[in-house]
Amino acid sequence: MRIGIYPGTFDPITLGHIDVIKKSLKLVDKVIVATTYNINKEYFFTIDERIEIIKKSLFNDLKLNKKKIEIISFDTLTINLCKKYKAKIIIRGLRAVSDFEYEFQLAGMNRKLSSNIETIFLMSDVENQ
């Protein structure tokens, strides 16, 4: 089974995030949407609220397959999360060229930490950015 981890704060989840999730479902058998907490960042919603909003958006509103999507919170390195769930793919969304530099560096660091885990970049459709 091909498992992908889609990490982010999702505060709140957007149409762009949802578009990336839908596109990633065409590439992997299961997507783990992993929301995190950063003490250096202010949030609109708590972790529990974000998880509930994600569930409602994906399962109630869009009726996406619950067997293909898992929603979790995490407080570790994404690479550690990949190892825990046996995921070989990290899914990242790009909105603009300005996102690429940061994401490229992050992907390189993750590659050094675990060479068998790939990062893929997906762009949401223009109307969802």
Q: What is each residue range found by the language model?
A:
Residues M1-Q129:
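Nucleotidyltransferase catalytic core that binds NTPs
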